């Protein structure tokens, strides 16, 4: 099948780019006279008008019923994103602000909370972020803290910044030497292991311990197993819904809000966003959920080094500043990875 994008000459592409940029900026249908005045296209309004007719016939722009101007269609935005725009890098001040804001986070929950707030602020869209899956997290450190003769606190820290604390009661009297011995055995066996694989190492740990210390170790391992349950698996957090009111949504606003409230919809949405290591854009009807077909989604994977842990992104109107939004999503994803790697 012939791709009609190949029949568009440079001038028509320039006209389409100008229409998208003006419509995103003004939220008003764009006419040929305005294009001639605002952009150095090098041709008359009449020539621009002819190009707009061709673009409309090919489905890249459309005419609202109440206006003589034209607006981009989903197809027009897709061509703009694929061929006519470049990702806009953030300014030094913006990058510095991101780094400062995120570096103050103390644990994974706060990283997620701060990231969503930051991304919503930077893009003026709705920000969404998926928690890292435990299947992609490993043990970074285990700590045992005596709280009394028969109480211990277990602290589990993962490479993705997750911190779990559990208090273990009702133990036989625990000496400092026993705690130190068990702490060392657990860390030797578990550090660097995937959380889902950690319980398989428990028999090895028990075998290293004297018989009289094993009941305490078994109690600790039982609580540790509970800590490994997928507390956040598949959870998606979103923020910035107040931005929707300023986006020009009207009849579709309730549908968008209802879709955002369904965690399973957001999980599926991010899962459909293609290669997790790449910046991905889904526009309008490309989104399978009916409630989100008036929106565009820009998403990127985040992680540690080459390992992608989950995705984050924004949801907004198809009338979106794509270069700026793509730049913000990409930058924030990179900074989140750096913060996680540094923990």
UniProtKB/Swiss-Prot annotation:
Gene Ontology terms describing biological process: negative regulation of DNA-templated transcription
Pfam family, one: HrcA
InterPro entries assigned to the protein according to its UniProt record, in alphabetical order: GAF-like_dom_sf (IPR029016), HrcA (IPR002571), HrcA_C (IPR021153), WH-like_DNA-bd_sf (IPR036388), WH_DNA-bd_sf (IPR036390), WHTH_HrcA_DNA-bd (IPR005104), WHTH_transcript_rep_HrcA_IDD (IPR023120)
SUPFAM superfamilies according to UniProt: GAF domain-like (SSF55781), Winged helix' DNA-binding domain (SSF46785)
Keyword presence, Repressor: yes
Molecular function GO labels: DNA binding
Keyword Transcription regulation: yes
Top-level taxonomic group: Bacteria
Keyword terms, alphabetized: Repressor, Stress response, Transcription, Transcription regulation
Function (record text): Negative regulator of class I heat shock genes (grpE-dnaK-dnaJ and groELS operons). Prevents heat-shock induction of these operons.
Homology family: Belongs to the HrcA family.
Annotated protein name in UniProt: Heat-inducible transcription repressor HrcA
Taxonomic lineage: Bacteria, Bacillati, Actinomycetota, Actinomycetes, Streptosporangiales
């Amino acid at each position: 099948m012939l791709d009609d994008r190949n029949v568009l000459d440079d001038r028509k592409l320039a006209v389409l780019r100008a229409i998208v940029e003006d419509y995103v900026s003004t939220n008003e249908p764009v006419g040929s006279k305005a294009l001639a005045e605002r952009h150095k296209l090098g041709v008359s309004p009449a020539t621009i008008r002819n190009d707009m007719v061709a673009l409309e016939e090919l489905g890249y722009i459309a005419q609202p019923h109440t206006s003589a101007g034209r607006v981009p269609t989903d197809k027009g935005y897709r061509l703009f994103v694929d061929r006519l725009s470049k990702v806009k890098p953030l300014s030094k001040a913006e990058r510095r602000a991101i780094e400062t804001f995120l570096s103050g986070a103390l644990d994974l929950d706060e990283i997620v909370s701060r990231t969503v707030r930051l991304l919503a602020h930077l893009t003026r869209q709705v920000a969404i972020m998926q928690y890292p899956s435990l299947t992609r997290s490993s043990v970074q450190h285990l700590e045992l803290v005596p709280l009394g003769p028969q109480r211990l606190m277990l602290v589990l820290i993962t490479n993705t910044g997750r911190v779990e604390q559990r208090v273990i009661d009702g133990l036989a009297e625990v000496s400092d030497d026993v705690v130190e011995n068990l702490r060392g055995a657990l860390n030797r066996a578990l550090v660097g292991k995937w959380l889902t694989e950690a319980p398989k190492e428990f028999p090895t740990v028990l075998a290293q311990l004297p018989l009289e210390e094993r009941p305490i170790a078994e109690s600790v391992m039982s609580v540790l197993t509970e800590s490994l349950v997928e507390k956040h698996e598949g959870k998606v957090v979103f923020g910035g819904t107040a931005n929707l009111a300023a986006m020009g949504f009207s009849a579709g606003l309730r549908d968008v809000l209802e879709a955002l409230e369904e965690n399973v919809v957001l999980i599926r949405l991010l899962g459909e966003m293609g290669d997790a290591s790449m910046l991905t854009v889904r526009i309008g009807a490309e989104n399978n959920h009916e409630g989100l077909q008036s929106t565009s989604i820009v998403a990127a994977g985040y992680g540690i080094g080459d390992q992608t842990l989950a995705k984050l992104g924004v949801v907004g109107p198809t009338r979106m500043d794509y270069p700026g939004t793509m730049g913000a999503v990409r930058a924030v994803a990179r900074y989140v990875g750096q913060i996680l790697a540094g923990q």
